[in-house]
Amino acid sequence: MKGISLSNLNFNALAAQIIATNSFFRPGDKMLAIMPMFHGFGLGIGIHTALIGGACCILVPKFNVNTYAELLIKKQPNIIPGVPTLFEALLRAEKLENADLSCLKGVFSGGDSMSIELKKKVDDFLKAHNASVQVRQGYGLTECVTASCLTPKDYNRVGSIGVPFPDTYYKIVKPGTTQELDANLEGEICVSGPSVMLEYVDNPEETHSTLRRHEDGRIWLHTGDLGKMDEDGFVYFSQRIKRMIITSGYNVYPGQLEN
């Protein structure tokens, strides 16, 4: 396990980026925060971003689908962040069968890749329960607190995890190098911006191999994730490099098999 050193700037930059790109995120909103506080997603978004934005954090100490469903109905939150398994559970929640979810202004999925099929099911579920929003996917890792890109509101591209936050830059490089690849070519996702970590604690070798200065002079976080970026800047996540399977000369990813 690697300890990650994050600064006040890292957390504050994340909060500013999320609030700036989500006009609905305003004082008085309520966020139903299910993600654990020891997780970058839970601390960085469920607590810090919510409080910076003047929102009320409704904390759920331990996930239980029935309790969560009851809170959705009773508290009428405006924002719910979660992971794909949470949304899978909500689809099966009997307590939500006739629930009115028109209170929702933002539904976000992160922490793991959401399949195209599951996203469609969740979107249909939200629409059937009077919500005017779709689930928006994001991508990030603890090395940049949590999310660093997000699907724009009402502008989804199938399979995409969104576009980078303001002041955050993405590039796709040939794995093991700093060579930037052209649009739509698959390689390692690299991130640069104000939310990128300071270092791995007491691990200078790992820090040096992960945070690299490229020819453009910027420090880039090499994520270890495979993906691509199209001509419009939309990012597509494939898989962790270490999970890639090579068979008959082809690169195969578990996520592709699931979809």
For the regions a language model picked out, list residue spans one by one:
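AMP-binding/adenylate-forming catalytic core of the ANL superfamily
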Residues: 80, 193, 198-199, 209, ...
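Active-site glycine-centered loops adjacent to acidic/histidine catalytic or metal-binding residues
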Residues: 111, 140, 162, 225, ...
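Short Gly/Pro-enriched turn/cap motifs at secondary-structure boundaries
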Residues: 159-165, 210-211, 217-218
